Amino acid sequence: MLLAPPSTPSRGRTPSAVERLEADKAKYVKTHQVIARRQEPALRGSPGPLTPHPCNELGPPASPRTPRPVRRGSGRRLPRPDSLIFYRQKRDCKASVNKENAKGQGLVRRLFLGAPRDAAPSSPASTERPAASGGWAAPQDAPEAAGKRALCPTCSLPLSEKERFFNYCGLERALVEVLGAERFSPQSWGADASPQAGTSPPPGSGDASDWTSSDRGVDSPGGAGGGGGSEAAGSARDRRPPVSVVERNARVIQWLYGCQRARGPPRESEV
């Protein structure tokens, strides 16, 4: 029966690899300092206290010199490429932004101020006009402004079907000839136009009672003798406010609807 060594039952475990290396250290280590020193096991949670041991225990000339140049070189050389890249990117971005802003400002100037070539010939022309004509500069510009303000469709181009339909209120040509084309002219729609004796009021103008009263004043002997009735009617007509466009259009629509109902056959109520 084999007996176990006296150390094993007291410890109750097998020697670890560190202990075995410590026992055989004299075989592969030649320095007496390393043989006399016992290596402690590495602690995972605290790497700080382990770092100074190799630096202090190794040779004094080699330990301080080796880490310093590596740290200095790594601290100075690593940020250089990144900083250069960042600097170049910022510089390129600023240059591109400045170019785009310059292009945008030039475009805005061309849109709002116009091209310099177009503005150059206009300035001497404007300076030559008062020098040559003197006080007659305003009469020369007046016809151009008047032509731009008032564009007469009858003078420029012949009336199309839509324009004719709008001007004659959608009526047929035969009915317009019967009623009189002069009643549809723009002058007949004004409130200041005085009616002639024996004429019916145009559609959209004042009430028929005003026209009949003025006609009666003219035809009556008192009106023919002194003219007081016509003057009173004229003053009353002047005091009346002019007819608005909305009211005139409403009267025209009502008049057209009445004409359509008069021309068509009578309708029977379905109620």
Curated annotation (Swiss-Prot):
Region of interest (Disordered), residue spans: 1-83, 116-145, 186-245
Q: Where is the composition biased (Gly residues)?
A: 220-231
Q: Where is the composition biased (Basic residues)?
A: 68-78
Q: Where is the composition biased (Low complexity)?
A: 116-126
- Any one Pfam family here would be FAM110_C
Q: Which PANTHER family would you find in this protein's record? A: AGAP005440-PA, PROTEIN FAM110D
Q: Which family does it belong to?
A: Belongs to the FAM110 family.
Q: What is this protein called?
A: Protein FAM110D
Q: Which organism is it from?
A: Homo sapiens (Human)
User: Source taxonomy lineage?
Assistant: Eukaryota, Metazoa, Chordata, Craniata, Vertebrata
